[in-house]
Amino acid sequence: MLTNPTIETLKTLKLYGMLEALEEQQQTPAIQALTFEERFAALIDRERLHRDNQRRTRLLRGAHLKVAAASIEDINYKAARGLDKRQIAQLATGEWIRRTQNLLITGATGSGKTWIACALAQQTCRQGASVLYWRVPRLIEELRIAHGDGSYLKFLKTLSKAALIVLDDWALTALSNQDRADLLEILDDRVNTGSTLIASQLPVDKWHAYLGEPTLADAILDRIVHHSHRIELKIPGESMRRVRASADP
């Protein structure tokens, strides 16, 4: 039986996975057939699994995904919206994140952009990488506030640390020159250091006109369009929001 000092020591060291596994071993007579090394290896494996699960939970909570339940396993390929299953499978490996490449998802309202973006972001968290989700209108507002209260540089640093940033609702609202400059700062910080996933109703070839100021537009697009993967979604006849709502119990 585990003694109270042993239990307290494991708790003090925050070895909760090991403690749980050790208690299970104490309640399993057949475990005595294993060698000490085998039992100890099982404890270490459980502790590592426990920590991995905790990290994934923290990453998912910190990502603030709009659709937290979205997962690549539940992506609907039956709807005729231009999804390539092989492309999604490749993106799901996370190799594009490791190579600090970008992903641009475009399509009309209801085509499932946000859901797919969140599914890939969730997959990134499950693989142990950090994610931040932002709707661009809200991000712009937060940047304006940060300029006013002196937290701008700290905010930029926080954004730069994420392995993946999801910028949803790109090109939805008008931008000021300061907004454009802020977006350039964010994207420039991520060159060769992090990936950016952009979801937008507006086709990529119209982004330059949307951004407006030619010099800043060139600089912004240079940092996101090159070395990027693209998914262009089509409306399958019915909004994917309605399709999912009707499928819910």
Predicted features along the sequence, with ranges:
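Dynamic helix-loop-helix/coil hinge segments at AAA+ ATPase domain boundaries and subdomain interfaces
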Residues: 7-9, 61-84
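Walker B motif beta-strand of ABC-family P-loop ATPases
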Residues: 164
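Interdomain "pre-motor" coupling segment immediately N-terminal to P-loop NTPase/helicase cores
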Residues: 16-68
